[in-house]
């Protein structure tokens, strides 16, 4: 078994995308490869085949390998629920919530989980493609590191260092990061990859020559800037819009302080007939055909934020003039009458009033519901698939008019009697073409075009593998993976 790790000079340098590309590139050559990220901090997560929870980036990387996501692919997941604290998920299950200082002392236990998962994957896969987190040169985080060089040292693996030239300062990033590493860590870095380059490569060549001479390490390749990739953002909210022939349906989503699984909206962002707007703090709330309340890692505090920002008044006005309102997961809970957190799972214990638009209440419980599900929307009987990740148990008469009839016999979500308000616990439902079309028609869009989001993502994974084939040093990459040259 061989392990190759990709680390970045910064967050968003391109680590997730490169690992996805390398996974598909190797898979196309018949190599049995598996993705791995020791520790991930993200609010976007996916449900695995073994009923756990991992970062969504690793789920996409699994798709690149034609594998089902598994908890061993991301053994430690941290989901922030305040500015200083996070829920700690080990092997797909939430085990505790702690602040950053407490977690620092917990890292030894977390590292055991990381190495256990790495060992298990190594028993089934000859190549493990690893993604680091943030930067390996964060001085304040280097002690007891499990996400970058601490892991690489523990399993004795080579490292590729990637940097984003589009931000500027790429040579300072690469050389500075390298020089902040220990001698043994520096020796692990086997080469550099420059990401998101625009322009004539000949103009960059003197810098590449200098970098190789300065460090004694090769530039494995320069990847071009790629427009319109349909891969899910690991954490940061992707507010890019694709070109629209015509803005037909206006959809507005509030950017909550603790928004989670905002990848739910990627299919809408890419839909040619949808104008999707994320509205952040201080921004005017525009007119809309559909308002969607997203998932939240801290429902009660985000409810308070919405009220303080005037969303309660805006929603009331929106409904009065015939607009449609939808809530997903935490957004569903907000639509009800009360949200109770007796255990203090998302902050101080207590209760908060919801918007009172659906006759139901939610109690947050310690045991999370984690499921991949299939079913049919009660709107148009449209097929839908998605996943549940929630600690809330919702009850009340509103649930008698369900939003989804699940194949396992359960019902999900609720609709208002007048048909203006709909809520569901299902993440990812817009990825189902039939369900997305039905919901857009419900929101008022006529002549809806069907968009296959899964096909778009698969196409772009192939595009990424093509870029690796064209722009990176294939023989060196195969050597680092313990493979013979083609």
Swiss-Prot record:
Protein family (similarity comment): Belongs to the CobB/CobQ family. CobQ subfamily.
Function per UniProt: Catalyzes amidations at positions B, D, E, and G on adenosylcobyrinic A,C-diamide. NH(2) groups are provided by glutamine, and one molecule of ATP is hydrogenolyzed for each amidation.
Range of residues in the leader sequence: none
PANTHER family referenced in this protein's UniProt entry, alphabetically: COBYRIC ACID SYNTHASE, DETHIOBIOTIN SYNTHETASE
GO terms assigned for molecular function: ABC-type vitamin B12 transporter activity; catalytic activity
Gene encoding the protein: cobQ
Keywords noted in UniProt: Cobalamin biosynthesis, Glutamine amidotransferase
Gene Ontology terms describing biological process: cobalamin biosynthetic process
Name of the protein: Cobyric acid synthase
Residue intervals of the GATase cobBQ-type domain: 248-435
Organism encoding this protein: Pseudomonas savastanoi pv. phaseolicola (strain 1448A / Race 6) (Pseudomonas syringae pv. phaseolicola (strain 1448A / Race 6))
InterPro entries to which the protein is assigned, alphabetical: Class_I_gatase-like (IPR029062), CobQ/CobB/MinD/ParA_Nub-bd_dom (IPR002586), CobQ_GATase1 (IPR033949), CobQ_N (IPR047045), CobQ_synth (IPR004459), GATase_3 (IPR011698), P-loop_NTPase (IPR027417)
